[in-house]
């Protein structure tokens, strides 16, 4: 069962990396130029600060998951003897997995809110609707947000597996004692 959980976690991490890289590429390569009244106007992800933040967050999350994938493949070939050190590493992985899930989900929500304002506009602040002029730009941002939320769900499952791997090391009868 141990090996199958590791394989499932590796497969989910690989899928997460693909979705995060796809999100970052869709955001980073998105721009559209239109001629409006003989003036060229360009819409880019750099115009929306939440998208710039999401680009950085998804890139760092993909790098973190790649690092964890490499570490887990290395640890699968090397079995440590100290159960105590493995517990510390399991705690570290659990906390980092939780932090990355929350960061990516929060970044996606911030970008979604900013994109919603771009979609609908806001008369009180004199913000114009962009999506009636830059349709391809808005469609591509919508696709990147969808990929980002799928990556968040995948990372939630990784965090659940990480929690399972952590708490199965402890005794069910003695509070916070490792199994021997």
Curated annotation (Swiss-Prot):
InterPro entries given in the database record: CASP/CASPL, CASP_dom
NCBIfam families given in the database record: A_tha_TIGR01569
Stated family: Belongs to the Casparian strip membrane proteins (CASP) family.
UniProtKB keywords: Cell membrane, Membrane, Transmembrane, Transmembrane helix
Spans through the membrane: 8-28, 50-70, 99-119, 141-161
Localization terms from the record: Cell membrane
GO cellular component annotations of the record: plasma membrane
Membrane topology, as annotated: Multi-pass membrane protein
Membrane side Cytoplasmic: residue ranges: 1-7, 71-98, 162-180
Superkingdom of this protein's organism: Eukaryota
Record note on quaternary structure: Homodimer and heterodimers.
Pfam families registered for this protein in UniProt: CASP_dom
Extracellular side: 29-49, 120-140
The name this protein goes by in its record: CASP-like protein XL3
């Amino acid at each position: 069962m141990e090996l199958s959980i590791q394989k499932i976690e590796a497969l989910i991490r690989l899928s997460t990396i693909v979705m995060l890289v796809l999100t970052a590429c869709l955001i980073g390569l998105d721009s559209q130029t239109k001629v409006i009244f003989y003036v060229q106007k360009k819409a880019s992800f750099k115009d929306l600060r939440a998208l710039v933040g999401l680009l950085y967050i998804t890139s760092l999350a993909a790098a973190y998951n790649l690092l964890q994938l490499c570490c887990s493949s290395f640890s699968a070939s090397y079995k440590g003897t100290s159960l105590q050190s493995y517990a510390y590493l399991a705690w570290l992985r659990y906390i980092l997995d939780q932090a990355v899930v929350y960061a990516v989900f929060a970044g996606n929500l911030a970008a979604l809110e900013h994109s919603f304002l771009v979609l609908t506009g806001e008369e009180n602040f004199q913000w114009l609707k962009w999506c009636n002029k830059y349709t391809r730009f808005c469609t591509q941002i919508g696709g990147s947000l969808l990929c980002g939320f799928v990556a968040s769900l995948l990372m939630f499952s990784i965090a659940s597996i990480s929690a399972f791997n952590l708490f199965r090391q402890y005794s069910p009868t003695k509070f916070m004692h490792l199994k021997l």
